[in-house]
Regions:
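Gly/serine-rich nucleotide phosphate-binding loop at the start of the catalytic core
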Residues: 1-81
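Catalytic micro-motifs at enzyme active sites that drive phosphoryl/nucleotidyl and oxygen chemistry
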Residues: 2-4, 147, 154-158, 173-182
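Well-ordered beta-strand positions in beta-sheet-rich domains
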Residues: 11-15, 156, 190
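Generic detection of short hydrophobic beta-strand segments and adjacent strand-loop junctions
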Residues: 12-16, 143-147, 211-213
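Short amphipathic alpha-helical coiled-coil/interface segments
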Residues: 30-33, 83-91, 249-253, 311
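Short coil/turn segments at secondary-structure boundaries
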Residues: 42, 46, 52, 98-110, ...
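Acidic carboxylate diad motif detector
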Residues: 56-165, 300, 304
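Positively charged, helix-rich recognition surfaces that bind polyanionic ligands
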Residues: 166-382
Length: 382
């Protein structure tokens, strides 16, 4: 039986700054993980260049254990094997891309990490100690972290290098809330959300009046970051690409964005719950951030907004509150007129099919219907 059908998986995050007593030890672990990643990748690359085939995890892991490979033995065995599995995943992703892409684009062979770089360290449950109540201790280290989570729900812990700090993520599971799937009928209480630049989220419903979550604070955070990043990059010596000040700037940006996204999502979901909403429809458009062209400045702002993260937060908060999520493809929703009953086609890459619609966009953010009614475009999309 698939356990994922019974559980929702969540994470508890702890930031480890340079001032933490555990920073140096975590930094050393991530450095050793990088060494093992590169050593495993080197072995795989040489095998591939010599034979045209890969060893993959099972074979290469046995060889490293048998030969007492120094980088493998530098970490606990249960940690080392997870690092090697990540090399395996990178190679399999490379092979899958190679098969699926028929556009002439060649995916890059997995590359070595920088010599002075760091890499993720993962501890599975068997490599963690729970002897001291309220704390998790990592195998063969002096690192322990506080947690209110029960041992039974904890799955693994991940140490992730970030810009100027480390992130400890405790991965745990929660039982899924069971609810009967609802069908869209005139009686269904639903809300629909469209994500954007100045308006992070525009929400409409058949229950309540439309509401808008302001996106300008995120634009402000990104503008401050981009402006100061350029200043600090100009001060860097030749062949140096980062500094402690740049890492600190990136850290502050990430924390501010995370805070705003979580608070916005929490506010929205609490409001949906108060209105007893059954279904939330989220607009989606595959590749919208990669292929967008709305001018240099708008491109920079739009791509700098982590919409995917916002959708993830919304999704898990809705799941916990019994609200179903529907994703709706929206490639032509800003051109089609709902009030005029326009058919909404789906964009297919490579096909230049022309479609005719009743209304038209008069300027950025406004739409004129067939009957000359002017509406906010974000609400037309919804």
């Amino acid at each position: 039986m698939n356990n994922s059908k019974k559980w929702n998986y969540r994470r508890q995050s702890i930031v480890i700054k340079r001032s933490s007593p555990f920073y140096k030890e975590i930094d050393n672990l991530c450095f050793k993980s990088k060494n093992l990643f590169n050593a495993t990748l080197y072995d795989e690359r040489q095998t591939y260049f010599d034979t045209g085939k890969f060893k993959f995890y099972n074979k290469i892991n046995k060889e490293f254990v048998k030969n007492n490979q120094p980088d493998y033995r530098a970490l606990p065995a249960k940690v080392s094997k997870l690092t090697q599995m990540k090399v395996d995943q990178a190679i399999k992703s490379f092979l899958a891309l190679k098969k699926s892409l028929n556009t002439g684009f060649k995916p890059h062979f997995p590359r070595y990490l920088k010599k002075d770089g760091r890499f993720v360290v993962e501890y599975e449950k068997g490599a963690l100690s729970f002897k001291k109540k309220g704390f998790i201790r990592f195998s063969k280290t002096n690192i322990y972290i506080p947690t209110k989570l029960e041992k039974s729900v904890i799955q693994r812990v991940r140490l992730t290098p970030r810009a100027g700090y480390y992130l400890i993520e405790v991965l745990y599971r929660k039982p899924k809330i069971k609810y009967n799937k609802k069908k869209l009928t005139p009686q269904t209480r639903f809300a629909s959300i469209d994500l954007g630049l100045n308006n992070l989220a525009t929400v409409t419903s058949n229950v309540f009046e439309p509401l808008i979550i302001n996106g300008k604070p995120i634009k402000s955070i990104n503008q401050y970051y981009n402006k100061n990043l350029k200043k600090k990059q100009k001060l860097l010596p030749i062949n140096q690409y980062t500094s402690n000040k740049i890492k600190q700037l990136s850290y502050k940006r990430e924390m501010k964005l995370n805070d705003y996204l979580h608070k916005s999502a929490k506010f929205l979901v609490n409001y949906l719950v108060s209105q007893t909403i059954d279904i939330l429809v989220i607009g989606t458009n595959k590749g919208w951030k990669q292929n967008i062209n709305i001018g240099k400045r708008n491109n920079q702002n739009f791509v700098g907004i982590p919409f995917y993260k916002f959708k993830q937060i919304l999704t898990y908060l809705c799941e916990e509150n019994g609200i179903e999520i529907y994703e709706q493809e929206e490639s032509y929703t800003s051109k089609a007129s709902f009030l005029d009953g326009d058919f909404i086609p789906t964009y297919v890459q490579g096909k230049n099919t022309k479609h005719t619609f009743s209304g038209s966009r008069t300027c950025r953010g406004l739409y004129k219907t067939k009957n000359k009614k002017t509406l906010t475009l974000m609400l037309m999309v919804l």
